[in-house]
Design a protein with these regions (language model features):
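Sec-dependent bacterial lipoprotein signal peptides
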Residues: 1-17
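A structural "domain/chain start" motif
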Residues: 17-66, 119, 139-141, 161, ...
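Short, glycine-/polar-rich solvent-exposed loops and beta-turns at beta-strand/coil boundaries
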Residues: 28-29, 72-77
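A short, local hydrophobic-aromatic micro-motif
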Residues: 33, 38, 70, 81-82, ...
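Soluble non-cytosolic domains of exported or imported proteins
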Residues: 44-55, 102-106, 146-158
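Surface-exposed short loop/turn segments
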Residues: 65-67, 75-126, 133-150
Length: 171
């Protein structure tokens, strides 16, 4: 009797801890089968960021979910995921003392996401998603590679992973 009481007392706190199995705490109702993901809107003065974020999000949804993903707004979709790039900043992070120029930069992107059902009901909303990525610059013009594009792609991948996880797992 003592052992069963002790076991019960030890297991009781676990019942209310919020633990759940994968996919059981989703913001997305079970009747949603098709998600539309139109190209994200951008309010930033940056080239191609909205495309990188849209493509990364579609790739992540295709990889991690069973939903049929449409890459455009469609009345046939059960829900639509709209994203907006709110800002994109690039700031010098480190300086090269010999050249007097920046040797690495920090790119910061702020975005928001809104998932709405076909009837207009909000299923998921996050108005402040912030991601940072560092990249190196070079003063060698012969070997110059535009590193900021690679940094944006890494930020987009991290953003998509976090967004899909938040939508699916409610963490």
């Amino acid at each position: 009797m003592r052992l069963s009481t002790l076991t019960l007392l030890l297991l009781l706190p676990l019942a209310g801890c919020g633990y759940h199995t994968v996919g059981s705490a989703t913001h997305i109702p079970g009747n949603v089968r098709t998600l539309a993901v139109p190209i994200f809107v951008t309010r930033a003065q940056a080239f191609h960021t909205e495309m990188a974020f849209t493509q990364a999000t579609i790739r992540e949804l295709n990889t991690r979910t069973k939903y049929r993903i449409l890459n455009t707004a469609s009345p046939d979709a059960d829900a639509t995921l709209n994203g907006t790039i709110l800002s994109q900043t690039v700031a010098p992070l480190t300086y090269d003392a010999t050249s007097g120029q920046s040797s690495s930069y920090l790119v910061t992107i702020t975005a928001k996401a809104l998932l709405t059902a076909h009837d207009g009901h909000t299923l998921y909303r996050n108005d402040a998603i912030i991601f940072h990525e560092q990249y190196q610059s070079t003063q060698d013009l012969n070997g110059f590679i535009q590193e900021d594009t690679a940094a944006i792609n890494r930020v987009a991948r991290d953003f998509a992973q976090a967004l899909v996880s938040d939508m699916l797992e409610a963490f």
